[in-house]
């Protein structure tokens, strides 16, 4: 049962599921399997060893020896070294020339400094002249002394002596006042009309009326809620 259930998930070789033989999975024996990198690496090593053997044979052969002797006679190595050195020096010279040109351009952009002109100092001799004397009129002084003279008021004793003796009067107004004899006491006589009338409370003529209660549901509502405040409208002219 297990083999039947998991056969769909197993890798297949064609139409046959591979349930037991796991050693062949991922190799070149399967259709669409992994690539054999070991064979490629071994082939590269073999090719490199073959090239090395060929080169060593050619270098140690008689032809190789003659070629090396010819190169030494013609001084090819020295020429190569000289060419490399001249190329390096030429590159350095070109770089130095470019740097010098850039410096000259920047110096030309700057404005030339103007030479400083020394200012000629002319010594002026001061001629002795007589001082001018100007007569100015006398100015009015700003702060003037103001002297105010005032008579002193008389003393209290002097005013008492000069005043007439005080006599009680019968009336408050001076035009109605009369001197009072010393034996009689001073009284203030008032007219009958001057006395204020006795206070008597005014009776209101407004009849007292009780609120009229209507019958039915309105009267019941008035008993529960109350009549409320009476609204009175009055017209006033200002």
UniProtKB/Swiss-Prot annotation:
InterPro entries: McpVI. Residues 34-54 are annotated as: Amphipathic alpha-helix essential for membrane lytic activity. Ubiquitinated by Nedd4 following partial capsid disassembly; which might play a role in intracellular virus movement during entry. Induction: Expressed in the late phase of the viral replicative cycle. GO terms for cellular component: host cell; host cell cytoplasm; host cell nucleus; viral capsid; viral procapsid. A motif (Nuclear localization signal) lies at residues 233-236. The record marks 33-34, 227-228 as: Cleavage. GO terms for biological process: lysis of host organelle involved in viral entry into host cell; microtubule-dependent intracellular transport of viral material towards nucleus; viral release from host cell. Residues 36-53 are annotated as: Involved in endosomal membrane lysis. The keyword Ubl conjugation applies. HAMAP family: ADV_CAP6. Belongs to the adenoviridae protein VI family. All late proteins expressed from the major late promoter are produced by alternative splicing and alternative polyadenylation of the same gene giving rise to non-overlapping ORFs. A leader sequence is present in the N-terminus of all these mRNAs and is recognized by the viral shutoff protein to provide expression although conventional translation via ribosome scanning from the cap has been shut off in the host cell. This is Pre-protein VI.
């Amino acid at each position: 049962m297990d083999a039947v259930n998991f056969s769909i998930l197993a890798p297949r070789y064609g139409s046959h599921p591979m349930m037991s033989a796991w050693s062949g999975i991922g190799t070149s024996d399967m259709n669409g399997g992994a690539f054999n990198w070991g064979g490629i690496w071994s082939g590269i090593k073999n090719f490199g060893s073959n090239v090395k053997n060929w080169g060593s044979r050619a270098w140690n052969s008689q032809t190789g020896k003659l070629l090396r002797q010819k190169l030494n006679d013609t001084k090819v190595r020295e020429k190569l070294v000289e060419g490399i050195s001249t190329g390096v020096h030429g590159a350095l010279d070109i770089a130095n020339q470019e740097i010098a040109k850039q410096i000259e351009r920047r110096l030309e952009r700057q404005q030339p400094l103007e030479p400083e002109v020394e200012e000629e100092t002319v010594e002026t001799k001061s001629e002795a002249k007589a001082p001018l004397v100007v007569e100015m009129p006398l100015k009015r002084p700003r702060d003037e002394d103001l002297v105010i003279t005032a008579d002193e008021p008389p003393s209290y004793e002097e005013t008492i002596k000069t005043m007439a003796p005080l006599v009680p009067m019968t009336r408050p107004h001076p035009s109605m006042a009369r001197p009072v004899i010393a034996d009689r006491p001073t009284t203030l006589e008032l007219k009958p009309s001057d006395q204020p009338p006795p206070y008597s409370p005014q009776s209101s003529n407004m009849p007292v009326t009780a609120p009229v209660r209507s019958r039915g549901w309105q009267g019941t509502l008035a008993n529960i809620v109350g009549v409320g405040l009476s609204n009175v409208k009055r017209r006033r002219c200002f």
